Amino acid sequence: FEDDFVWQGDDYRVKREEARTALIAVAEACLGRKLQDDPLIVGTSGRYEFRNKGLDVLLEGMKRLAGLERLDREVVLYVMVPAANRGARADLQKHLQDPSQPIDGSQWPWATHYLENMQWDPIVRAIDGSPLADPASKVHVIFVPSYLDDRDGIFDKSYYELLVGMDLTLFPSYYEPWGYTPLESIAFSVPTVTTTLAGFGLWIDRRE
């Protein structure tokens, strides 16, 4: 990474605050309600390889977490994995610009974009009918099936401009030659969890 890859000082604090504000606003719009103060914002990203990237394990872990009786803090997991979609949800766009605009109740609430072939989507199928779909749950998943390149239509920020607002990232890969995403997370001072089945995780493990 270049020396100026990560914001420093006041610039970092401003970017983090802006990112958290955006992440919370989008989650609340999708869920149709306010979150508790200071939710734990968790993220994962990468190619849409449901098993190889460990998305199956991650979502199963979130289901178990949602089943805990005593969970003091709300958790929002952002799954930022590009997938076939037909653009940003118009109702979310309007609501984010003007909160008096209603959310379309006919839309699948946990995605920011119109998904193609929803009935076959592994993330959709993992959430539907699970504790993660319970409105009373304190654990929420928001699926962002778009490249984050400043023009996704919902955030209109880059991936790094959102990464900086997270409290934790999770990359439970089954296999990864190296894996840049945990390294990027650390670069932005966001704690990360990965596996020793990924090159970066194995390298860290051997240095301990």
Predicted regions and their residues:
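Catalytic cores of carbohydrate-active enzymes across secretory and cytosolic contexts
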Residues: 1-208
